[in-house]
Structures are given as C-alpha cells and as structure tokens.
Swiss-Prot record:
Its main location: plastid. It is found in: Plastid, Chloroplast. GO terms for biological process: ribosomal large subunit assembly; translation. PROSITE patterns: RIBOSOMAL_L20 (PS00937). Keywords: Chloroplast, Plastid, Ribonucleoprotein, Ribosomal protein, RNA-binding, rRNA-binding. Belongs to the bacterial ribosomal protein bL20 family. This is Large ribosomal subunit protein bL20c. GO terms for molecular function: rRNA binding; structural constituent of ribosome. The keyword Plastid applies. It comes from Platanus occidentalis (Sycamore).
Length: 117
C-alpha cells in the first residue's frame, strides 16, 4: 500500500502553536508536546496576572494618595478623604486621584480642603 499524506489541519495547528512559542527558550520552542504545555501554562499565567495587575495598581494608587494626603495634614488620612468624597458625591476614582496627587499636589489639597468644609 502506498503512504497516504495527511491533511494540513494538524500541521496548521502545530504551526500556530510554534509561532506562539517561538520566543520561548530551548525545547519549549521546538518540541510540539512541550510547546503545547508551555502555551497553556503561559495563557494561565497571563489570565491570573491580569487580575493581579488590577489589584497591584489599586494598591499603588491608594498608597500614593495616602502619602500625599498625610503630608498636608497630620490628622487627615486616605480613608477619611474617600469617605468625605462619597459624602459630597464627588465621583473621582482612585486612579485619577493618584494622578492628581503626583502631578499637581496643590489641586489635591484644594479638593481635600473643599470637601472638609
């Protein structure tokens, strides 16, 4: 019997996986089975770390806001600022507040003084 050549579907799938893993080191970029395993592992890590990144940035923003607020007044803190913002119904999220705190501290001081009154 003559040899039957298989279709291109499996080859196309492996090529796609190889392109994804082309920047991996060693056998992880060459061998099909390890490439497939590393691709799954990379995608799992990427999915997990997207959630972690959101948490880490939120922590960073809160730390920055708290540091700038505590410089201005001794008795004022981040939690009081956020509480007063909600009481006054000012819709400023933590990312924007952190950017204001870094770039223009006087503006953040003005905001905090206004909401204290």
């Amino acid at each position: 019997m003559t040899r039957i050549r298989r279709g291109y579907i499996a080859r196309r799938r492996r090529t796609k996986i190889r392109l994804f893993a082309s920047t991996f080191r060693g056998a992880h970029s060459r061998l099909t089975r390890t490439t497939t395993q590393q691709k799954m592992r990379a995608l799992v890590s990427a999915h997990r770390d997207r959630g972690r990144q959101k948490r880490n940035f939120r922590r960073l923003w809160i730390t920055r806001i708290n540091a700038v607020i505590r410089e201005n007044k001794v008795s004022y803190s981040y939690s009081r600022l956020i509480h007063d913002l909600y009481k006054r119904q000012l819709l400023l999220n933590r990312k924007i507040l952190a950017q204001i705190a870094i770039s223009n501290r006087n503006c953040l001081y003005m905001i905090s003084n206004e909401i204290i009154k």
